[in-house]
Amino acid sequence: MKTMTCRELGGSCDLEHHGEDANEVIKAQDRHLRQAVAEGDVDHQTALTEMKGRWKRPVSGLKWYRRVQRDFAALPADAGVR
């Protein structure tokens, strides 16, 4: 299990997302951004818009995805978790 924050994934806060792989934390970030914006949090709107835009621009979106996977792989496992 590893941890990445909203900010590390392009967001505006330090909420921690935990997962066994990068895809799990990306999905958690997606849910977090959508929920925050739905609740009226304008600080997260930019990150949500950028996330949606990645799917419209596959080359830059894939570059972001690969960077997140690389960053996730470089993280140490969470303490106390095997």
Where are the predicted features?
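Metal-centered catalytic cores of metalloenzymes
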Residues: 1-82
